[in-house]
């Protein structure tokens, strides 16, 4: 039985694509084990998926000051030894890095043991670890063609996304329009305030039906904003059935995390994207550009956004079949079947490593 060790940690943006691949690999009779960090949130998700879970002691360098940088070589060496021991014990056919601090020492350990290393980069702007490891990897799989990682080992496939999105029909003309606002698990305060204000500036006959997902922490703030603006909306902390939510939507207003942009592509839903302004290396702006390049939306920087500007852009997109045209453009040009294609790549590399 083939075995793949998956390295991922830190945020859902790294962990959830790894879990999607682990599930698809299990369907192909491939065993997976997981390497994460001691203090990351990934353990609860991986345990829930019943995947054997190992940890190493490593954390990020950004924001740790001079002392953190001075300690870094010793911490990386210690984590490298831990990862090397785990890889020796598990003896995987291949090591897959999905992102997070764990991939630095884990990737170096895999290389030191001559294990094939595959990297998956979810964002258009690669993280530091992937940039450093990419020249030594057997394969680098990128989500977006805008990625700055280059080389003969690089291939653009996409991000694994939830099942059912790619089979959704494209947007069809109807009235009223349906607007989906996604604040993410932690909420987006700027969207909570700005979207209700913008909608209040539209004539009532032009206002769309609204579903606004806020996250638990900002639910009350968003509900108060809609009430103050005298705008009707279905405000919810979480959406259990995202496929249905995308199916109903004609237009989406959201941040531009890698998985959100990939889901928009898979669902063929146009969007007004408001990148999180404090993202590392401004990677959300680069992610957003991937959808814009498919004629599937536009970027509004939070610093430039006013309720008047957002109202004008909402009117623009909801008029003259622009949503329908953009939806068709996305469906015709966006990557598809990413999960299946990545699994095929991994199985091929596993076979070549055995022989």
UniProtKB/Swiss-Prot annotation:
Pfam families assigned: Glyco_tran_28_C, Glyco_transf_28
UniProt EC number: 2.4.1.227
Presence of the UniProt keyword Manganese in the record: no
Cellular-component GO terms for this entry: plasma membrane
Enzyme class, UniProt record, top EC level: transferase
Topology in membrane: Peripheral membrane protein
Record family assignment: Belongs to the glycosyltransferase 28 family. MurG subfamily.
Protein name: UDP-N-acetylglucosamine--N-acetylmuramyl-(pentapeptide) pyrophosphoryl-undecaprenol N-acetylglucosamine transferase
Species for this entry: Hydrogenovibrio crunogenus (strain DSM 25203 / XCL-2)
UniProt lineage: Bacteria, Pseudomonadati, Pseudomonadota, Gammaproteobacteria, Thiotrichales
